[in-house]
UniProtKB/Swiss-Prot annotation:
InterPro entries per UniProt: AAA+_ATPase, AAA_lid_4, DNA_helicase_Holl-junc_RuvB, P-loop_NTPase, RuvB-like_N, RuvB_C, WH-like_DNA-bd_sf, WH_DNA-bd_sf
Name of encoding gene: ruvB
Region (Head domain (RuvB-H)): 254-338
Main EC class the enzyme belongs to: hydrolase
Residue numbers binding Mg(2+): 65
Any one GO MF annotation of this record: ATP hydrolysis activity
Positions with a binding annotation for ATP: 19-20, 61, 64-66, 127-129, 170, 180, 217
Subunit structure: Homohexamer. Forms an RuvA(8)-RuvB(12)-Holliday junction (HJ) complex. HJ DNA is sandwiched between 2 RuvA tetramers; dsDNA enters through RuvA and exits via RuvB. An RuvB hexamer assembles on each DNA strand where it exits the tetramer. Each RuvB hexamer is contacted by two RuvA subunits (via domain III) on 2 adjacent RuvB subunits; this complex drives branch migration. In the full resolvosome a probable DNA-RuvA(4)-RuvB(12)-RuvC(2) complex forms which resolves the HJ.
GO biological process, one term: DNA recombination
Domain comment in the entry: Has 3 domains, the large (RuvB-L) and small ATPase (RuvB-S) domains and the C-terminal head (RuvB-H) domain. The head domain binds DNA, while the ATPase domains jointly bind ATP, ADP or are empty depending on the state of the subunit in the translocation cycle. During a single DNA translocation step the structure of each domain remains the same, but their relative positions change.
A GO cellular component entry from the record: Holliday junction resolvase complex
Name of the protein this chain belongs to: Holliday junction branch migration complex subunit RuvB
Pfam families the UniProt entry points to: AAA_lid_4, RuvB_C, RuvB_N
Catalytic activity as recorded in UniProt: ATP + H2O = ADP + phosphate + H(+)
Amino acid sequence: MTRLVTPDITEDDLIESSLRPRALDDYIGQEKAKGNLRVFIDAARKRGEALDHVLLYGPPGLGKTTLANIIACEMGVNIKSTSGPVIERPGDLAAILTNLEPHDVLFIDEIHRLSHVVEEILYPAMEDYQLDIIIGQGPSARTIKLDLPKFTLVGATTRAGLLSSPLRDRFGVISRLEFYTDDELTTIVTRSARILNIGIEPEGGRELARRSRGTPRIANRLLRRVRDFAQVRADGVITAPVVDESLKLLEIDEKGFDHMDRTIMLTIIDKFGGGPVGLDTIAAAIGEERDTIEDVYEPFLIQHGFINRTPRGRVATRAAYEHFGRIAPPSSSQGNLF
């Protein structure tokens, strides 16, 4: 069963592409990144040039794909989208690059998952707008250079640290996307409700935003699920009590925690005395992949002060003990982390 509060894209999310803003003026939040992009886009348009290459990084579900599409719309060009795992061979990338028009945007999601061989092809394409193609094999092999139209590469990643330095250094614009505030998410929920013709009261929107883990993708997904409850049990209007009742039935608490979040936290607290405990040990204890815990679950728990990362492992904070109704051990036993 798919988690309702997963920040990753689900089939349900793909249906509601109408919720994506098409212009920077309609994009809510990320003011710093948005302000910088507006300046760079305006300058590129005035010069009649392609926008410099852009790297967007941050936790999943914060709008990296949406921003890539907005960049193309604001520049008045086409966008071609792909992802790192899909580009398996240099020939795959060459086929994409040679079909670009001048100033087009090439969006590569999960760019940190590009293979080293494919990256080598990308370097001259980004820097010199040239494609090096090797013809033949062995001593008779030769390299020919193909000129490419000047294009903009927009890369998106949740793990910027895994990008190689040569690739990262070729991006002229690097922006980190942050978790959204409750006020920003309330605005997003209200806008989405209007587009979907959902009746929602201000307090209902605020309560829904508060449980959305700082992530617009989750907010929009919860909005659709709560809408179902409202239509069946509350005359179709989303109020704060309707949000509370429906999310309780979906096992999402007032902090936005679901069953997996509680499993991780209670494993650290109950099985390992609050930590420190290694990530591999946690993964084995709950039957989940290490990378999934680190990339999907941990950012939210750390952001809200429920887990501390230490050289010796993960440690549950006093806030975590209080939230789950457990008695915290003396500070000294947790390395004075409280």
